[in-house]
């Protein structure tokens, strides 16, 4: 891999896929440093709101006997700096991160004079996680407990943390001999906002180790708008070309998986929570009945049609079938004294709505490929604009409202090869179009005519 991509004017990028591999330094076990920029053929870095650490795969073509010279053994440090200068503003954007090799895999000698292998890398706190287990008493909000684990056990500096500590209820618990990241996952299973939204613990390449709720995501501003357009209208090298390709969706695909059958079975729209208090031997038979309401939607319309004549749901509206999904929770109201909440207590009030968030967050999912963006990260909101398949026949209204709208960036695969590209998984928990507003063509009765081509 050359240190620069070919699409540069001086040090400025002609396209959003341009970048400069400015630094890639490997520190061996004995402290010796090696500049390995010239040996790299590809870098792939993955981040996700479901992953506690970013990870990287660095593909090496070794023609200088690095493996023996550095005595590679699988715990080396790699300091990475990738940057780009914008063509019009001359502002410099960058990704800078310190990784630690977790595995060296895929060794091969396919030609004389060189060998290939792959460094799999993780962040420092993921490495630290493997060195200890926790079996401590903790109290406070779950968010504050998680923040404490990050700073004291995972040794993450405060400046590299962004933790929402305002989780529902102060609790007391004993962590049952878990590694720090497993303890955070265990605690997070009972972490909610005051209105029942779930939390996510994750790391991004651009930012910090973060702990945020779905409400935090939904309340944030849209950071970019991307357009799925079949043609480019500007000339390469111009400012207009850079701007146009920056917001263009190059590929869009989806497994779709739209299913009210599965969602209703998961309690996405209605459920009942039943609890037993083992201290007082009382059972809440009536339960906490939840019907879909109060969920913060990314777009304006619910993820289900509002109708009453649902034969498949026993003639009930889909958001009223609360007996179809039941959650059973054991609590101990006297574990730490009167009016002291133990670990399970927040779930009694919040489990139904939390599951509604979790079951509807991927109501509609797309995988898109876009040009490299140094400022896009998981947990942000974007808008996409998708043209109708018959856009040329609908010039007055060419936008597909069902596919367009606000989406949450759930994961990003940063790929640095000939160009910098992003493969982004985006999700929305709602629609940009009313599902009750079914279009009817002239000359049909209560249905839409479909013309086969």
Question: How should each PLM-predicted stretch be described?
Answer:
Residues 43-72, 233-453:
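An acidic/polar, Gly/Ser/Thr-rich interaction patch typically located in mid-to-C-terminal regions
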Residues 1-131:
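Assembly/oligomerization scaffold segments
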Residues 62, 84, 123-125, 205, ...:
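A mature extracytoplasmic/lumenal domain signature
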Residues 56-59, 121, 130-160, 175-202, ...:
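Amphipathic, non-transmembrane alpha-helical segments in extracytoplasmic/periplasmic proteins
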């Amino acid at each position: 891999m050359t240190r620069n991509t070919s699409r540069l004017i001086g040090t400025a990028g002609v396209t959003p896929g341009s970048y400069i591999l400015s630094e890639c330094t490997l520190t061996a076990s004995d402290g010796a440093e090696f500049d390995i920029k010239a040996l790299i053929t590809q870098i792939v870095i993955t981040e996700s709101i479901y992953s506690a650490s970013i990870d990287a795969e660095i593909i090496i073509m070794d023609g200088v006997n690095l493996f023996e010279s550095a005595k590679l053994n699988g715990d080396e440090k790699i300091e990475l700096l990738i940057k780009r200068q914008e063509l019009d503003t001359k502002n410099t954007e960058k990704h800078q991160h310190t990784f630690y090799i977790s595995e060296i895999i895929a060794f091969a000698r396919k030609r004389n004079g060189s060998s290939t292998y792959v460094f799999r890398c993780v962040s420092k706190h993921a490495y630290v996680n493997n060195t200890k287990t926790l079996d401590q008493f903790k109290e406070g909000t779950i968010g504050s407990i998680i923040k404490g684990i990050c700073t004291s056990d995972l040794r993450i500096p405060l400046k590299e943390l962004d933790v929402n500590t305002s989780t529902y209820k102060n609790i007391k618990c004993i962590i049952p001999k878990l590694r720090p990241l497993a303890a955070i996952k265990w605690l997070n299973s009972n972490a909610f906002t005051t209105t029942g939204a779930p939390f996510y613990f994750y790391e991004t390449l651009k930012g910090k180790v973060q702990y945020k709720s779905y409400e935090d995501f939904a309340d944030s501003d849209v950071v970019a708008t991307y357009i799925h357009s079949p043609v480019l209208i500007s000339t390469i090298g111009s400012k207009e070309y850079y701007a146009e390709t920056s917001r263009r969706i190059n590929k869009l695909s989806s497994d779709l998986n739209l299913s009210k059958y599965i969602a209703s079975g998961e309690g996405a729209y209605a459920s009942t929570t039943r609890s037993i208090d083992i201290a007082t031997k009382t059972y809440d038979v009536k339960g906490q009945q939840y019907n879909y309401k109060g969920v913060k939607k990314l777009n304006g319309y619910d993820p289900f049609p509002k109708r009453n004549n649902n034969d498949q749901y026993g003639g009930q509206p889909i958001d009223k079938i609360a007996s179809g999904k039941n959650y059973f929770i054991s609590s101990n109201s006297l574990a730490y004294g009167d009016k002291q909440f133990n670990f399970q207590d927040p779930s009694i009030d919040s489990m139904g709505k939390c599951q509604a968030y979790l079951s509807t967050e991927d109501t509609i999912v797309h995988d898109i490929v876009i040009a490299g963006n140094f400022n896009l990260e998981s947990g942000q909101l974007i808008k996409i604009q998708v043209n109708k398949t018959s856009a040329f026949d609908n010039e007055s209204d060419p936008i597909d409202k069902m596919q367009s709208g606000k989406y949450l960036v759930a994961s990003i695969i940063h790929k640095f090869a000939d160009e910098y590209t992003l493969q982004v998984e985006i999700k929305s928990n709602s629609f940009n179009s009313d599902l009750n507003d079914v279009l009817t063509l002239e000359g049909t009765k209560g249905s839409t005519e479909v013309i086969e081509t």
